[in-house]
Amino acid sequence: MDEATAAGFIKDHVQLCYDVCHFALEYEQPAAVLDKLSAYGLKVGKVQISAALKADLPTETDKRKKIIEAFRQFEEPVYLHQVIARTAAGGLIHYPDLPQAFADADNSKVAEWRSHFHVPVFLESYDPLSSTQADIKAVLALQKKEPFTQHLEVETYTWDVLPAPLKDNIDISISRELQWVLQQLDD
């Protein structure tokens, strides 16, 4: 078998799992990512529909502290909640978990935080925080327009560690997740 044939087999059988939360954490635009994958002949085998937490970090100290305190309610020991900060100049700072981000919370160069906490996809606002739900909507709109995978999976797994005000009956929560995704695909 020649190299081109082998490469074709690999690209047919080794495919990418597009986790919407992970790409959103890195501030990647869904259409640009999918275009680049296509340009390289790489296929998406599965989309994991998931949302991260995010918030702009104001320069005003009191407003900034309110945002940081809101993130603190999501600090828990079961999962790592990596934080990727975007600076005002457009650079990225990676923190391995929330405590390291909290230690740098007064960094005035940081304009936004995104945290790897798979929050329910059906909620956009976690006042004063929000989610990366818009990225999910963008991916699903692209899937509707020109399907690029047959495998969609909702990947919220943090039900047991959500702050108390966000907890609901697990059956109801999962049903809401699936209904929300179906609504996006039907619109």
Range-by-range predicted roles:
Residues M1-F102, V110, V119:
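Acidic/histidine-rich catalytic cores of soluble enzymes
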Residues K43, T87-D186:
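Flexible, acidic glycine-rich loops studded with aromatic residues
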